[in-house]
């Protein structure tokens, strides 16, 4: 059984409102990526500015615990925000809490740049406080954007639309490198300084304190630009009909968006809801969806260990690849410029294409195949880097850069995209946002393993440590490959068919007997 409003959404041709939804939701992910990854470009500058000790004879460096907090605290906030807003998205509505996440992102991006204090410790403490709440807002964007896009899209292009929203993360990473590169180039040209080797004191320009603040605050701009349009979006038809039980409002909203006439079918909706009223934490849910939830959570957890380790430790690996000079050969702002430039190049030629390959091929190859291919290829390239690390570092840095870039490509033309898409499709409407939040939060738990574990291990930039880290990540990706067998293909099917909400039984989403949709000839069974 399918409601007319749901069939209309599934069969709708691609229209302008689909494009606007992608842009509005996608700009949130642009901001998310920019805010999460721009800290990588300026963290070494923070060390030079606030933690320089002349007695060491080396440029200032953030202590391990401070570095882990500055780069990783936003991930803790993101995990918390995913669970909080994901739950509210199912209880209050996707739209009602969608604007709150954006307000948090704008306010905390600005406040991060205004971090204050009389000592280095207090400045870093204030920065960490605001970046936690920045991450909290970012976290809410994950389940809400994915759920909204999946519920707006038609079944033929749903995967491509959700992937396109997520692909804006790649644009955000590029801009994190580009903005830092442009600002540091301007400051470098305006405020000349010797290298650390020539003058340890004068090599750190005091104007760098303004520069890192500008880098962080610029993240507020794209989010602020989309707030009005985000508030103008109607609630999704699936939420209004299936969760609120208001078939008339759902039909009216979607008829206006699709520019067609849709019947309300309130009586049919009552039967639909009665067949799907089991709670999230129930035996019935785990019978029907437990395997998929375990699959989406474990694969995202393992993927983010590798993905965030790569992104957050780039600044430590770039010197080993020969992409930037040694720190004592540069002044503070020059180091930001070279780190940002290397990050921009890797993102432009490795990260960015992978996202859009997924957009273009997800409806042809399917989510499942792309995820398996991505995990496997990441494991292969990281294993090669780990085994041949000494040769690549000392004799063939260009091949090192190519292999490293390919790991980013197959992360994004692979599990980094599909782990975002699949939880938005596999689960029933009334728990879709929560299940996506649980999967995404598992991912951020993996990101924290990368940020606090792998990053801490590689921070000194020693060859042996980076080599071992690559081997660990290769094994992590291989485990992710096998965990991917717990999920299933969703392309070309309606959300209700995938989740079993329409009453049809499938091999992968069994419908327990007491939850069959009652016909007019038989009495309805008691619902558990």
Swiss-Prot record:
GO cellular component, as recorded: periarbuscular membrane; plasma membrane
Entry's Gene Ontology molecular function annotations: phosphate transmembrane transporter activity; symporter activity
Localization of this protein: Cell membrane
Null allele phenotype: Impaired phosphate (Pi) starvation induction of lateral roots formation. Abnormal structures of arbuscular mycorrhiza (AM) fungi (e.g. Gigaspora margarita and Funnelliformis mosseae) during AM symbiosis with swollen main arbuscule trunks and reduced branching. Lower symbiotic Pi transfer for AM fungi to the host plant.
Residue stretches in coiled coil: none
Transmembrane segments: 19-39, 69-89, 97-117, 123-143, 159-179, 209-229, 293-313, 342-362, 372-392, 402-422, 434-454, 468-488
Record keywords, A-Z: Cell membrane, Glycoprotein, Membrane, Phosphate transport, Symport, Transmembrane, Transmembrane helix, Transport
Reaction catalysed by this enzyme: phosphate(in) + H(+)(in) = phosphate(out) + H(+)(out)
GO biological processes: arbuscular mycorrhizal association; cellular response to phosphate starvation; detection of phosphate ion; lateral root formation; phosphate ion transport; response to symbiotic fungus
Extracellular compartment spans: 40-68, 118-122, 180-208, 314-341, 393-401, 455-467
Induction of expression: Induced in roots during development of arbuscular mycorrhiza (AM) upon colonization by AM fungus (e.g. Glomeromycota intraradices, Gigaspora margarita and Funnelliformis mosseae). Induced in root tips by low phosphate (Pi) levels.
Tissue specificity field: Expressed only in mycorrhizal roots, exclusively in cortical cells containing arbuscules, upon arbuscular mycorrhizal (AM) symbiosis with AM fungi (e.g. Gigaspora margarita and Funnelliformis mosseae). Also observed in root tips of non-mycorrhizal roots, in a phosphate (Pi) depended-manner, highest expression levels being observed in low Pi conditions.
InterPro entries (alphabetical): MFS_dom, MFS_sugar_transport-like, MFS_trans_sf, Phos_permease
Ranges for region Disordered: 496-528
Family: Belongs to the major facilitator superfamily. Phosphate:H(+) symporter (TC 2.A.1.9) family.
Function in brief: Low-affinity transporter for external inorganic phosphate (Pi) probably involved in the acquisition of phosphate released by arbuscular mycorrhizal (AM) fungi (e.g. Gigaspora margarita and Funnelliformis mosseae) during AM symbiosis; required for propper mycorrhizal arbuscule morphology. Acts as a Pi-sensing machinery at the root tip level, independently of AM fungi, involved in the regulation of early root branching and lateral roots formation.
Protein name per its UniProtKB record: Low affinity inorganic phosphate transporter 4
Protein species of origin: Lotus japonicus
């Amino acid at each position: 059984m399918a409601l007319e409003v749901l069939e209309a959404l599934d069969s709708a041709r691609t229209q302008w409102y689909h494009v606007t939804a992608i842009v509005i939701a996608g700009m949130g992910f642009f901001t998310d990526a920019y805010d999460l990854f721009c800290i990588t470009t300026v963290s070494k500058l923070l060390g030079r500015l606030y933690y320089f000790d002349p007695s060491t004879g080396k440029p200032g460096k953030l202590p391990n615990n401070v570095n882990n907090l500055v780069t990783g605290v936003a991930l803790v906030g993101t995990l918390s925000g995913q669970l909080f807003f994901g739950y509210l998205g199912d209880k209050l509505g996707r739209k009602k809490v969608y604007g709150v996440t954006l307000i948090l992102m704008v306010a905390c991006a600005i406040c991060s740049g205004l971090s204050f204090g009389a000592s280095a410790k207090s400045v870093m403490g204030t920065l960490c406080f605001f970046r936690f709440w920045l991450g909290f807002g970012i976290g809410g964007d994950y389940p809400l954007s994915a759920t909204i896009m999946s519920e707006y899209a038609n079944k033929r292009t749903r995967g491509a639309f959700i992937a396109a929203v997520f692909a804006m993360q790649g644009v955000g990473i590029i801009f994190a490198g580009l903005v830092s590169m442009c600002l540091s180039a301007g400051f470098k040209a305006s405020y000349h300084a010797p290298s650390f080797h020539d003058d340890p004191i004068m090599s750190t320009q005091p104007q760098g304190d303004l520069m890192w603040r500008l880098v962080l605050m610029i993240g507020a701009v794209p989010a602020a630009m989309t707030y009005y349009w985000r508030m103008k979006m109607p609630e999704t038809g699936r939420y209004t009909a299936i969760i609120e039980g208001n078939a008339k409002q759902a039909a009216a909203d979607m008829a206006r968006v699709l520019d067609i006439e849709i019947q309300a079918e309130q009586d049919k909706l009552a039967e639909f809801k009665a067949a799907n009223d089991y709670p999230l934490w129930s035996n019935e849910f785990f019978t029907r969806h437990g395997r998929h939830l375990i699959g989406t959570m474990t694969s995202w957890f393992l993927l983010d260990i590798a993905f965030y380790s790569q992104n957050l430790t780039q600044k430590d690996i770039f010197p080993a690849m020969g992409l930037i000079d040694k720190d004592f050969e540069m002044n503070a702002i020059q180091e930001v410029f070279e780190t940002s430039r290397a990050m921009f190049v890797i993102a432009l030629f490795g990260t960015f294409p992978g996202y859009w390959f997924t957009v273009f091929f997800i409806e042809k190859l399917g989510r499942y195949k792309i995820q398996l291919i991505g995990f496997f290829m990441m494991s292969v390239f990281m294993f090669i880097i780990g085994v041949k690390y000494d040769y690549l570092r000392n004799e063939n840095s260009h091949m090192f850069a190519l292999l490293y870039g390919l790991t980013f490509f197959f992360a994004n033309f692979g599990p980094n995209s599909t782990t975002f898409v699949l939880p938005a499709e596999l689960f029933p409407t009334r728990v879709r946002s929560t299940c996506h939040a649980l999967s995404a939060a598992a991912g951020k738990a993996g990101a924290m393993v990368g940020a606090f574990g792998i990053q801490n291990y590689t921070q000194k930039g020693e060859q042996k440590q980076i080599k071992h880290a690559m081997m660990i990540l290769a094994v992590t990706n291989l485990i992710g490959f096998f965990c991917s067998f717990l999920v299933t293909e969703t392309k070309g099917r309606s959300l209700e068919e995938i989740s079993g909400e329409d009453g049809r039984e499938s091999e992968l989403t069994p419908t327990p007997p007491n939850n069959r949709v009652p016909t007019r000839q038989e009495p309805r069974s008691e619902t558990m």
